[in-house]
Amino acid sequence: MITAETKDGFAVELSEEALDNVELLDALAAVQDSDVLSLGRTIRLLMGKEQTRKLYDHLRTKDGRVPVVALSNALGELMESFRAGKNSSSSPA
């Protein structure tokens, strides 16, 4: 399992197999190409429906919105944290 955390404290734990998904790779590529409509799908593919709902609730503003920029930033931070966690877990002890 790999644990990732955003800078504001949202944490999620995933198996390494969750990252081995070509559909996730396609969705990440679309987000990288500035296709913001792929952002929600990317998060769901990465974390599943329940964890996605928790992230949305974590990012939700007082007026009930989940800002696109906040979600995009969270995705970047989670991917960065997953990479760091994967690298540290595979390093020799």
How should these model regions be labeled?
Residues 10, 15-93:
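Short, surface-exposed, charged amphipathic helix/loop patches that serve as local interaction elements
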Residues 1-5:
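Short acidic, Pro/Gly- and aromatic-enriched capping/linker segments at domain boundaries
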